[in-house]
């Protein structure tokens, strides 16, 4: 039975790069954000309920979800955000579980869940938590470089996420991504060897044995 590691981290921490390095090592990779995107893509199963709750204004004339409009609405209103999460989180959970069931031979796999610290229900899907950590200034710089957002906008996004201390408290393992991509790859390879060893000998190793 494949054991699953929940990979998480704040925006700009490098979690997606780390997840890709695991995938390069032929480790099964599941991405919660991709699952969410598929659920809200054309003909996605979440669309009818989103339309019922949020109305036609968040859809274009072709029936496609206007993600920018919806994002602004939920960012401005905690109650609207909670409403969307009531629709999306159970569907994302089910989609991840379905994808996990397609992997049976791998010793372990990676589930990339950016909001794992905030949404603890996903812990039941994993055995260990790996937090990708990085200094705040590096995180801000990375996001500004790739997105064109201002420093203030990035800082605002970070302020709405879980704190670094909260993520570290949840973690079984921490990867400090404070250097180059080469360094990140090397650290990922060390963790790969570690996980391959512990899960081959003790499949339930870790704090999170859901």
Swiss-Prot record:
Coiled-coil region list: none
Main enzyme class: transferase
Domain of life: Bacteria
Pfam family membership, one: CoaE
Enzyme Commission number(s) of this protein: 2.7.1.24
Signal peptide: none
Pathway: Cofactor biosynthesis; coenzyme A biosynthesis; CoA from (R)-pantothenate: step 5/5
Compartments (UniProt record): Cytoplasm
InterPro entries: Depp_CoAkinase (IPR001977), P-loop_NTPase (IPR027417)
Keywords: ATP-binding, Coenzyme A biosynthesis, Cytoplasm, Kinase, Nucleotide-binding, Transferase
Binding residue positions for ATP: 12-17
Catalytic activity: 3'-dephospho-CoA + ATP = ADP + CoA + H(+)
A biological process from GO: coenzyme A biosynthetic process
GO molecular function, one term: dephospho-CoA kinase activity
A GO cellular component entry from the record: cytoplasm
Residue ranges constituting the DPCK domain according to the UniProt record: 4-202
Family according to the record: Belongs to the CoaE family.
Role of this protein: Catalyzes the phosphorylation of the 3'-hydroxyl group of dephosphocoenzyme A to form coenzyme A.
Official protein name in the record: Dephospho-CoA kinase
Organism: Neisseria gonorrhoeae
Gene this protein is translated from: coaE
């Amino acid at each position: 039975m494949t054991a699953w590691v929940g990979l998480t981290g704040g925006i700009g921490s490098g979690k997606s790069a780390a997840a890709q390095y695991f995938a390069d090592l032929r480790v099964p990779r599941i991405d919660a954000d991709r699952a969410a995107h598929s659920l809200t893509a054309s003909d996605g199963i979440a669309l009818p309920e989103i339309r019922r709750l949020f109305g036609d204004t968040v859809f274009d004339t072709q029936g496609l979800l206007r993600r920018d409009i919806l994002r602004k609405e939920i960012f401005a209103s905690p109650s609207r955000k909670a409403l969307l999460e009531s629709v999306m989180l159970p569907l994302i959970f089910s989609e991840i579980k379905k994808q996990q069931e397609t992997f049976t031979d791998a010793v372990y796999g990676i589930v990339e869940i950016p909001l794992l610290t905030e949404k603890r229900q996903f812990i039941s899907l994993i055995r260990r938590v790996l937090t990708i950590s990085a200094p705040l200034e590096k995180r801000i710089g990375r996001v500004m470089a790739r997105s064109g957002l201002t420093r203030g906008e990035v800082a605002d996004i970070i302020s709405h996420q879980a704190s670094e201390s909260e993520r570290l408290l949840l973690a079984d393992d921490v990867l400090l991504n404070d250097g180059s991509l080469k360094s990140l790859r090397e650290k990922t390879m060390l963790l790969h060897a570690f996980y391959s060893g512990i899960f081959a000998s003790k499949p339930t190793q870790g704090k999170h044995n859901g």
